[in-house]
């Protein structure tokens, strides 16, 4: 895995797939934001949070980066508790 600091061993298939997707975004800044968050928090996310994380990974990098770093306000359907955890985790 590109950049991941943890082993995917012991993670279920869904979490392993999300870990790979988080680290292989296409925009290096988002690799670091989402990949580091996934390394640290993915194993402990609930099923609902995993679903939310999957939806966040579908958002184009440029848009997600603007929301994460606060240059644009995230829409209400994106500004979930999980999104706020990602923003708090990322030092912007």
Regions inferred by a protein language model and the residue ranges of each:
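Positively charged, polar, low-complexity stretches
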Residues: 2-92
């Amino acid at each position: 895995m590109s950049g991941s600091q943890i082993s995917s061993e012991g993670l279920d298939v869904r979490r392993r797939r999300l870990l790979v997707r988080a680290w292989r975004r296409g925009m290096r800044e988002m690799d670091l934001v989402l990949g580091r968050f996934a390394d640290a928090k993915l194993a402990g996310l609930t099923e609902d949070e995993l679903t939310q994380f999957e939806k966040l990974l579908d958002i184009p990098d440029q848009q997600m980066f603007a929301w994460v770093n606060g240059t644009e306000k995230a829409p209400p359907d994106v500004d979930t508790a999980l999104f706020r955890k990602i923003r708090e985790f990322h030092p912007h």
